[in-house]
């Protein structure tokens, strides 16, 4: 008997796929389309187990859908721009392009060795000119519409990577890649007006029926829509006003001070003549701007000489510069009510600012102790003049009416989300296609001159971008007036590239951004990736899709119908990482056990959404199962050569039992496939093989039927072995182009059933009975059974409880 030689099987199968262009996909309107996509990787150089799991999930889905008769698009590409490549290139004294292309070549060979069914004819590399040319073109269209703009902005500055970070890229006050403490800095930045789409992005979350609730909740919270009042506080002895937004106008009469951001114009003006304030502002620049950090870090402030007038009471109120107020949120100012806001209370305690209670509880029995903490619940207004006695709802309306009539405020809908800062001050990115002219201002590059190519002959350093030091890149003629001008040296945030790549896969060689194929394939039917992308990539991609729709490039509203967020791969309870020394190299596993074993383990060890705990024993178990599958084929290959057909009238009792088990497991596998519960699909395969091995006298036709069902269920998981055995057993040419098995409902109709017999609730017997018996007949047969009679002779049968074809309980006394 031949041994399971996974190496030869996998090489020959992969060669077959290559020769036959098995995975190449074309538009076919006669078939239902299915677009299956896993998030494209950054070409780091080698695959890790997280990659293996993520892309195996996608491959299993793609292969299953293909066997369902659908026209499946399953592409792959590379998120190739960004700081890691630039930093690696500096370290290894190579160009980022060389470094990236070398990594791609190796990782692609690893993908192929795992048997992934990618259509490589659609491969995209985001650092290629043919790709980024079209995002430059798209940016220009957005600029012409007023959806892209440039302004001075206080940004999160990473002093190590020498670039700006979006708020989402600051983790615990540190840069998400470098780990450096982030600083605040004001520089010119390019932005996209994602706020123009905030309402639609929020509302359309309701369309995402097949997205995890956790991701939808994260996006809802990030967009952060809230309704409230903008209140105007007049600066004393000045014509200026400070506007603040509040969702709690019922607390307006309890305002004890205003807090303004360290970068607020009034703060900066006073700092010119106040060195202590200037020093405080400098200190604030070194603190985190992330909301999570602001909530936990020490509250610090500096009392200014600025006073404002309360819009209702006309009281004079102090203005403090506070480290927890952000210039990028609203107007950079907040009204502070220490009695009814815990953060304001903590600040007031530190600086001995008095409290004024203006809300009391609806519950008269509740004692409010402002010495211990703020009272933050809604209730009844007190100490609020004409508004005393009002509840929140009525107070909101009354105060809104007063402020509006007095021109001292207005109702506002506010969003937590802010426009997306897309400028990065590094080299290895897509050049922003803008030119700065002293006379004309910012001018887009002429479309016929696109792409604006990234220079390749550059001297890379760790101190920012070298583009500003390349005269032939910077010095250009203004596209409008022809006078000498300067090219923009910022590059796009790499999330710009990954926000539309899924659409370009549909037409990767089109001489336009997208063509008609985009509307055939989009939206993506199944998107697979980590939940860590919930509020960056997934939100930006939704935004881009709506921008492309409004540009007439796509017809759908949303990019991804169904989202699967896979869990992490853990070892010893921790995420695999070099720093923890718990990395498992997939290539070593492939060399030792074969790609099919690695794939099978990664799908069987846990449901896709849950974390997978690495286990060498689990890998060995997966390999052992595949050897059993191979050995069964070897032992029975003579049978398959006979071309036997199943004849139901000739089936034995054992055949029928086996077919019931096989088709029951097939039915469960189909259900679990559609739910993406792949671990239980693999379990069904194991049960089918056990059935085939456990019955000694199965008909050859049942063996052939059962094993062909097993191979087709297993094929999406272990494509090499199943392809090989399918051909070896003369079942067909290519299992991938074979229809997925269907359940024979006749096989699920039992001739007999096993009945559990209880007497007074205790198990006494198990009887095999004819399935055609009625309830009365079952009762007669059971009561007449000699073994049962031995328990009930000379006893009174009080009643008989029968659960059809499962259990009968005889109550006696």
Curated annotation (Swiss-Prot):
Signal peptide: none annotated. Gene3D superfamilies: 3.10.20.590, HUPs, Isoleucyl-tRNA Synthetase, Domain 1. The keyword Protein biosynthesis applies. SUPFAM superfamilies: Anticodon-binding domain of a subclass of class I aminoacyl-tRNA synthetases, Nucleotidylyl transferase, ValRS/IleRS/LeuRS editing domain. It is an enzyme of class 6 (ligase). PROSITE patterns: AA_TRNA_LIGASE_I. One of its GO terms (cellular component) is cytosol. ATP binds at residue 578. Its EC number is 6.1.1.4. It catalyses: tRNA(Leu) + L-leucine + ATP = L-leucyl-tRNA(Leu) + AMP + diphosphate. This is Leucine--tRNA ligase. InterPro entries: aa-tRNA-synth_I_CS (IPR001412), aa-tRNA-synth_Ia (IPR002300), Leu-tRNA-ligase (IPR002302), Leu_tRNA-synth_edit (IPR025709), M/V/L/I-tRNA-synth_anticd-bd (IPR013155), Methionyl/Leucyl_tRNA_Synth (IPR015413), Rossmann-like_a/b/a_fold (IPR014729), tRNAsynth_Ia_anticodon-bd (IPR009080). The keyword Aminoacyl-tRNA synthetase applies. GO terms for molecular function: aminoacyl-tRNA deacylase activity; ATP binding; leucine-tRNA ligase activity. Keywords: Aminoacyl-tRNA synthetase, ATP-binding, Cytoplasm, Ligase, Nucleotide-binding, Protein biosynthesis. Belongs to the class-I aminoacyl-tRNA synthetase family. One of its GO terms (biological process) is leucyl-tRNA aminoacylation. A motif ('KMSKS' region) lies at residues 575-579. A motif ('HIGH' region) lies at residues 41-51. It is found in: Cytoplasm.
